[in-house]
Amino acid sequence: MPRFTKTKGTLAATALGLALAGAAFADPVEDGLVIETDSGPVEIVTKTAPPAFLADTFDTIYSGWHFRDDSTRDLERDDFDNPAMVFVDRGLDKWNAAMGVNGESCASCHQGPESMAGLRAVMPRVDEHTGKLMIMEDYVNACVTERMGLEKWGVTSDNMKDMLSLISLQSRGMAVNVKIDGPAAPYWEHGKEIYYTRYGQLEMSCANCHEDNAGNMIRADHLSQGQINGFPTYRLKDSGMVTAQHRFVGCVRDTRAETFKAGSDDFKALELYVASRGNGLSVEGVSVRH
């Protein structure tokens, strides 16, 4: 991927830099999130102490929920109002559907979706059998292809988004706890390198927005810390679900760079690194964002 291109891109980067330099700062909204569900209220940790490797960067890490307006935050307080729950229901239909060539369903092996509780909180992770870094999409596709005999689902396809929404919901309220040591360490380091590398004509890195300018207002948007504990999320701008891999493509493309592909080894490593920056926050299951 090209890091940057000079000429017009440099001028655009300068203009954006000036905009950021003059941007107004707004503290994250001081609020607490308790979600009303059919099973009762679920308290969500949306701010906490940073992981050790970020201790010199942030005093507190915040879920992106704190950087949204009142109406958007309120949509997440009750499952009845949360538009993402439609996609959870679609995922449940797929879970129980006899999709396999021999009539297998997800439930045939895993029983109810609650068997997935805790998975979202530790993803991505290095698979103990293959030694490869796996995102949740990889595990879903392993079942789809190897156990059901179907064609692989696209990483950002509707089928995948529906299933990820259902699976993620089972870990709602659990603390994000991805491993970054041992076999995960080289992948984590690669993801960190991507996070701090400037890309595109705008010569911007992930850190430029979500670390250097977190809390600033630009183009009526309140820049967050870029946490992904709420993904997959219902994005009001897109009127649909967005996964972390999907969002990475959009972010890099916004720098006017030729982006890595969703589900690529590079974006898997980036997802591991970004997820680790939110260790200690709660999985929000399916959140709502602008």
From Swiss-Prot:
GO terms for cellular component: cytochrome complex; periplasmic space. It comes from the Bacteria. Its main location: periplasm. It catalyses: L-cysteinyl-[SoxY protein] + thiosulfate + 2 Fe(III)-[cytochrome c] = S-sulfosulfanyl-L-cysteinyl-[SoxY protein] + 2 Fe(II)-[cytochrome c] + 2 H(+); S-sulfanyl-L-cysteinyl-[SoxY protein] + thiosulfate + 2 Fe(III)-[cytochrome c] = S-(2-sulfodisulfanyl)-L-cysteinyl-[SoxY protein] + 2 Fe(II)-[cytochrome c] + 2 H(+). GO terms for molecular function: electron transfer activity; heme binding; iron ion binding; metal ion binding; oxidoreductase activity; oxidoreductase activity, acting on a sulfur group of donors, cytochrome as acceptor; protein heterodimerization activity; sulfurtransferase activity. Heme c 1 binds at C106, C109, H110, C143. SUPFAM superfamilies: Cytochrome c. One of its GO terms (biological process) is sulfur oxidation. Residues 1-26 form the signal peptide. Keywords: Electron transport, Heme, Iron, Metal-binding, Periplasm, Signal, Transferase, Transport, Zinc. Heterodimer of SoxA and SoxX. This is L-cysteine S-thiosulfotransferase subunit SoxA. The lineage of its organism: Bacteria, Pseudomonadati, Pseudomonadota, Alphaproteobacteria, Rhodobacterales.
